[in-house]
C-alpha cells in the first residue's frame, strides 16, 4: 500500500478546517503524491484554490490532486456494486434484490459507507490522503459507521459459512464466502489504517462552542490519533497546535504563507 498518512480535518463549521486542509495538502504534495478530498456537503476547495475542482480527481499542481465528492453519486455507485454482486450469487431472487438496493440507497449510513469505501481505494494510489471533513456530527458518524459495518460483515461471514456447507453437500460451487472474506479483509485494512496511519486534527478557534465540538471529537475517537488545532490563534494558552490568522488565504501563493509548520512537524515526526 502506497499510503503513509490519512489525515482528517474536522470541527465546527466556519473554523477554517478547509483552509488548513488545503494548505497542508499543498505542502505534503511537495514531498509525495497527495490527494485532497472534500466530503463536506458545502464544498470549498474550488473557492480556496481559485481553481475549479469538481467531482472527478483533478491534478491541481505537480503532485497535488483534489476531488469534491458528490455523496449521492457515490451512494448510487456503491448500491449498484452491491446489487451486481448479490444478483450474481442469488439470481433466483433478482426482484427482491432490486428492492433491497433501494433500501441501501436510502439507509441512514449509506453515504458514510460509500465514502469510506472510496477513501480506502484512494489509499492504494496516494502517499497522503487529506480529507476536508463535514461538520463534527457528520464526521463522527463516518467513524461510527465503520464499526457498525465491520460487525455486519462478521455476521454475514457466519451466514455464508453455513450456506457453504449446504452448497458443498449439494455438490455446487459457492463463491460467496470468499467474496465476503475479501470484503472483510478490505475492512481490516481500513481498521489498520485508522489505527496506525491516521491523524484527525480537531480544528477550533477561541470561541467556546467550537472548542467544545473539538473536544467532543477527542473524546469520541478514542482509538484514533486526535490533535487539537486552534486556528486564527490570538492569545489562548492550551496544549494544542496554534495557527495564526492571515487575511484572504485564497490561491496557491496565499496558502503557502499560512503558518502550518507545527501541523507538518506533527505529521512528519
Language-model regions: role of each:
Residues 44-48, 74-78, 137-141, 236-238, ...:
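Switch/connector loops and helix/strand junctions flanking conserved nucleotide-binding motifs
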Residues 90-201:
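Phosphate/Mg2+-binding loops and adjacent switch elements
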Residues 7-8, 36, 128, 201, ...:
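Hydrophobic "anchor" residues on beta-strands that sit immediately upstream
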Residues 7-69, 133, 142-149:
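Walker A/P-loop NTP-binding active-site region of P-loop NTPases
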Residues 50-103:
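P-loop NTPase motor core
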Residues 26, 30, 121, 219:
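Short, well-ordered alpha-helices that flank and scaffold nucleotide-derived cofactor binding pockets
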Residues 2, 52, 184, 188-269:
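C-terminal lobe/tail of nucleotide-utilizing enzymes
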Residues 4, 32, 125-127, 223:
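Short, high-confidence coil segments that cap the C-terminus of an alpha-helix
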Amino acid at each position: 500500500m502506497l499510503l503513509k498518512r490519512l489525515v482528517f480535518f474536522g470541527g465546527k463549521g466556519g473554523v477554517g478546517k478547509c483552509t488548513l486542509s488545503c494548505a497542508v495538502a499543498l505542502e505534503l504534495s511537495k514531498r509525495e503524491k497527495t490527494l485532497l478530498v472534500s466530503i463536506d456537503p458545502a464544498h470549498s476547495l474550488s473557492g480556496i484554490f481559485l481553481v475549479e475542482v469538481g467531482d472527478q480527481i483533478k491534478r491541481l499542481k505537480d503532485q497535488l490532486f483534489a476531488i469534491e465528492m458528490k455523496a449521492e453519486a457515490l451512494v448510487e455507485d456503491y448500491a449498484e456494486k452491491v446489487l451486481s454482486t448479490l444478483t450474481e450469487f442469488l439470481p433466483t431472487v433478482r426482484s427482491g434484490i432490486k428492492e433491497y438496493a433501494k433500501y441501501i440507497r436510502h439507509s441512514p449510513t449509506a453515504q458514510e459507507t460509500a465514502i469510506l469505501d472510496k477513501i480506502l481505494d484512494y489509499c492504494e494510489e496516494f502517499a497522503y490522503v487529506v480529507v476536508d471533513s463535514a461538520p463534527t456530527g457528520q464526521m463522527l458518524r463516518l467513524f461510527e459507521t465503520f464499526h457498525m459495518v465491520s460487525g455486519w460483515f462478521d455476521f454475514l461471514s457466519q451466514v455464508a459459512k453455513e450456506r457453504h456447507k449446504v452448497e458443498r453437500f449439494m455438490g455446487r460451487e459457492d463463491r460467496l464466502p470468499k467474496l465476503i472474506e475479501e470484503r472483510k479483509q478490505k475492512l481490516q485494512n481500513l481498521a489498520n489504517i485508522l489505527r496506525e496511519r491516521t491523524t484527525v486534527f480537531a480544528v477550533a478557534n477561541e470561541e467556546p462552542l467550537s472548542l467544545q465540538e473539538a473536544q467532543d471529537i477527542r473524546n469520541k475517537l478514542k482509538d484514533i490519533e486526535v490533535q487539537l488545532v486552534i486556528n486564527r490563534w490570538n492569545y489562548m494558552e492550551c496544549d494544542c497546535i496554534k495557527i495564526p490568522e492571515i487575511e484572504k488565504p485564497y490561491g496557491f501563493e496565499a496558502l503557502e504563507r499560512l503558518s502550518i509548520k507545527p501541523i507538518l512537524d506533527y505529521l512528519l515526526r
